[in-house]
Amino acid sequence: MALERSDVEKIAHLASIKLNEGDLPHITSALNSILGLVDEMQAVDTDGIEPLAHPLEASQRLRADVVTESNHREAYQSIAPAVESGLYLVPKVID
């Protein structure tokens, strides 16, 4: 599938992108190159190939999920200018 100038102009209009007239040939060529690459990838025979989440069969060593810090919420809220029901109150900044 090859894009023409009118296709690129329509895509730019739909995306609300303003393009310079001088850039249209370059952009059209670049988009056609990308679509050509997609066509090449679509042509590859992938029958019998299992989908992969990752190309390597490696697993990560994970640490134990252990709490390492204590809860300082009360100490932080005791010095806050305004707190209500455990939430910090801040001044309204948008009308």
Curated annotation (Swiss-Prot):
PANTHER family: GLUTAMYL-TRNA(GLN) AMIDOTRANSFERASE SUBUNIT C, MITOCHONDRIAL
InterPro entries: Asp/Glu-ADT_sf_sub_c, GatC
Enzyme nomenclature, EC number: 6.3.5.-
GO molecular function, one term: ATP binding
Family in the record: Belongs to the GatC family.
Origin species: Pseudomonas fluorescens (strain ATCC BAA-477 / NRRL B-23932 / Pf-5)
Keywords annotated in UniProt: ATP-binding, Ligase, Nucleotide-binding, Protein biosynthesis
Broadest EC class assigned to this enzyme: ligase
Gene: gatC
Protein name: Aspartyl/glutamyl-tRNA(Asn/Gln) amidotransferase subunit C
UniProt-listed GO biological process terms: glutaminyl-tRNAGln biosynthesis via transamidation; regulation of translational fidelity; translation
Phylogenetic classification of the source organism: Bacteria, Pseudomonadati, Pseudomonadota, Gammaproteobacteria, Pseudomonadales
Keyword Nucleotide-binding part of the UniProt annotation: yes
Transmembrane segments: none
Catalytic activity of the protein: L-glutamyl-tRNA(Gln) + L-glutamine + ATP + H2O = L-glutaminyl-tRNA(Gln) + L-glutamate + ADP + phosphate + H(+); L-aspartyl-tRNA(Asn) + L-glutamine + ATP + H2O = L-asparaginyl-tRNA(Asn) + L-glutamate + ADP + phosphate + 2 H(+)
Subunit record text: Heterotrimer of A, B and C subunits.
Function noted in UniProt: Allows the formation of correctly charged Asn-tRNA(Asn) or Gln-tRNA(Gln) through the transamidation of misacylated Asp-tRNA(Asn) or Glu-tRNA(Gln) in organisms which lack either or both of asparaginyl-tRNA or glutaminyl-tRNA synthetases. The reaction takes place in the presence of glutamine and ATP through an activated phospho-Asp-tRNA(Asn) or phospho-Glu-tRNA(Gln).
Pfam families linked: GatC
